[in-house]
Amino acid sequence: MSFELPALPYAKDALAPHISAETIEYHYGKHHQTYVTNLNNLIKGTAFEGKSLEEIIRSSEGGVFNNAAQVWNHTFYWNCLAPNAGGEPTGKVAEAIAASFGSFADFKAQFTDAAIKNFGSGWTWLVKKSDGKLAIVSTSNAGTPLTTDATPLLTVDVWEHAYYIDYRNARPGYLEHFWALVNWEFVAKNLAA
């Protein structure tokens, strides 16, 4: 069984003007697809063939880990975004954010700051720790909370390929627009899991 590029949960132009169709074409259609292709080539004929993406991530290293984690991270990221989304969360997500960060405004400021300061290529995550509290975690390169006991709730991709076409080297501008796309329904499902 080989892995396939999962379908986007929206049209390629649906996130405009915040993320352009051109960015989606390169980021999803080229970068994400390349991770899928590389992973399939790397696991062919190995003990990883036939395992789930999560099993591979938790038990691999090097190129297999990097490509498997990037496939998973990107799929998760696309689901963290939605057209006509953003705003503030409600319900249990809003309550959990307030309990852990004081307010949504404080959380948003801390998450944005962590993502801006995430040096080089990587991901910034909102996770639920094993004690139930929420935390902001930044990972480098293909790092993912799947290798910890934390549950990922939300992520932003801060590799330059995520924003360079639309925002050049202005990561803060990309993050400002990210908040207009956050799919709080997806975050709520992750929190409830």
Language model region names:
Residues 1-193:
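Feature for soluble, non-membrane regions of globular proteins
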